[in-house]
A protein has these predicted regions:
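Cysteine-nucleophile amide-bond enzymes
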Residues: 1-153
Length: 153
């Protein structure tokens, strides 16, 4: 058994898939990456985020488990991505795991916050109960668990 006081590693995966919605976000923001996911089980996943539930349809969208591999390749190109590692205490890691597990167990309750994502373009944050967009979900988990102190732009 390992030492339970050792730091644990979580992973933040940023991607830009080339879907029409990703291209729209990229055009509006000029950000290199347009999607965020969080993983707790190593650099190859699984990762959790708010995204489309089916690869060929933009809707419905909600809380999904993402596997890297096929998702990081399309028929046209490889998907640009960036993987960050963050060391956290065992308590924060456990808190993140509990939060993600609880939400994923009730994933039908959660919906994609399309209005919230669109309102970001106008710097007007829109929080809706049980609605998230990808970076809102990841940032909320990091903030609520105490993993990072995040300020709003």
């Amino acid at each position: 058994m390992g030492n339970t006081t050792e730091a644990r590693t979580i992973y933040i995966l940023l991607t830009r898939s080339g879907t029409w919605f990703s291209r729209l976000i990229h055009l509006a923001t000029a950000d290199s990456y347009t999607h965020a996911s969080i993983g707790l089980d190593g650099p190859i996943g699984p990762f959790y985020s708010f995204a489309r539930k089916y690869s060929h349809f933009a809707l419905p969208a909600g809380l999904v488990e993402e596997q890297i591999g096929p998702e990081l390749r399309t028929k046209r190109q490889q998907v640009p991505c960036c993987l960050y590692e963050l060391s956290v205490s065992p308590e924060i890691y456990a808190s993140l795991r509990r939060q993600i597990s609880a939400m994923y167990a009730q994933r039908q309750r959660y919906h994609y916050n399309l209005l919230g994502a669109l309102s970001c373009f106008f710097n007007l944050p829109l929080d809706r109960r049980d609605h998230y967009f990808c970076s809102q979900f990841v940032a909320g988990l990091l903030r609520d668990s105490g993993a990072l102190e995040l300020s709003k732009p």
